[in-house]
Amino acid sequence: MISADIMPMDASKSNQNDDYSGTYVTSYATYVLTYNKSTNSIHEKAIYSDGEVFEHDYIYSDSYNGITYFDLDSNEDKGSIMFAGPGLMYTYDGSVTIRQ
């Protein structure tokens, strides 16, 4: 679990106001996502089990067959965050994790 000083101040309120913001926990990382409605983008803070922390920004890309895609906002790197529905994020191993 992550400490309160890592979680965005409005994460609990955001969970009720949009389909993406919140904390998603897997066996290897905790992801804190903050959705920006005005830019249709997501800021990700990933805290891995080994203590490494990475931050990335993603922009809305597409919705296809019920899956919503946000692509990494970078010219150098490629990556996506995918959602199966509100609060249901796909993980790198293909499983779905539920927003906490």
Write out the residue ranges for each language-model feature.
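N-terminal prepro-regions of secreted/extracellular proteins
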Residues: 1-5
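N-terminal glycine/threonine-rich, aromatic-flanked beta-hairpin/loop signature
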Residues: 23-66, 93
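Extracytosolic low-complexity repeat regions of secreted or lipid-anchored proteins
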Residues: 66-82
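Short, exposed beta-strand-loop hairpins at the edges of beta-sheets
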Residues: 78-96
